[in-house]
Amino acid sequence: MKKTAILPVFCLILLSFCTGKTDKPITDGQPAPDSATVEVTEIIDTVPKEIIIEKELLYDQHTLEDTYPYKDTTREFQWEKIKERLTWLESIQKEPATWSILQNYRNKNGEAPLVKNYHRDSYRRIADSLGVERFQGIPLYLTTDTTVPELYGRDGALVKHLEDYTNFTRVASVHTGKEWMIPKKYIQTIPDTIVFKKAVFVDTRNQNIATLEQEGDKWLVRSMNPATTGLHRPPYAQETPPGVYIIQEKKPRMIYLVDGTTETGGFAPYASRFTNGGYIHGVPVNAPR
């Protein structure tokens, strides 16, 4: 069966692949384990192999060096951290598993219920105790209590798909391994024909971005460029949230508005949306005034 690569995004790190299995019909009221819970006897190499990174640029404009000056400081590409994430990315694909994406762009799957503990953030929006906003959020319920959500998940986030029930899906966080129950309408299961062979790493501290592609036993650097990530500037601009996300949408050009208006501010080429209204894109062009 032909495998297809999809792009994951890491902040620091973005991704591009998932392995999933076709869900079996579920008997009403009875939980049915998906393929990720089936016991498989397999010998797995427990010693992580060395990650080999080589530069083979496909985009060579505005390329940065590994370390470069910026104003009165020095910035860098954090290759050791990138290797750690790539090791993780390879390791999660060694064993059979099903992966899913959390989705609720512009509340298209319904406004999430209020969590147990919430507050108004600096944008005057409802947020959970960790600062994740209700708007575009995905309700995360404890496995022992599906009446009121505990926290919100972020749109575009990658999760491990564990088990399907009538109205809920049990998933595990790729960061902590903690398990949650999520209403099915917020879950998009990734087909098992998908593999992670490309990754985008966004470094919000050093303000740079690197794209890599796996070929054989090597990861090839396809681009190394400066990046301007989001800033915390209420009431409009927001910082780029950390995490591992899957590219959900691509546009040849993305129209953006002047803050607080419906007036077109300009456009940005080659835009890829990874979480909420957050895009990776080319250099924006302002509309003529």
Please identify what each model-predicted range represents:
Residues M1-T4, S122, I126-D128:
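Positively charged n-region of N-terminal signal peptides that target proteins for export
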Residues T147-Y152, Y236-A237:
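Short, surface-exposed secondary-structure edge patches
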Residues T19-K21:
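Bacterial signal peptide processing site
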Residues E133-D145:
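Short, structured beta-strand/loop micro-motifs enriched in basic residues and often containing a Trp
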Residues G29-K116, E150-Q188:
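SH3/SH3-like beta-barrel superfamily modules
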Residues A5-F10:
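Sec-dependent signal peptide hydrophobic core
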Residues L15-F17:
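C-terminal motif of bacterial Sec signal peptides marking the signal peptidase cleavage site
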Residues D164, P183-R289:
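Gly/Pro-biased beta-strand-loop elements
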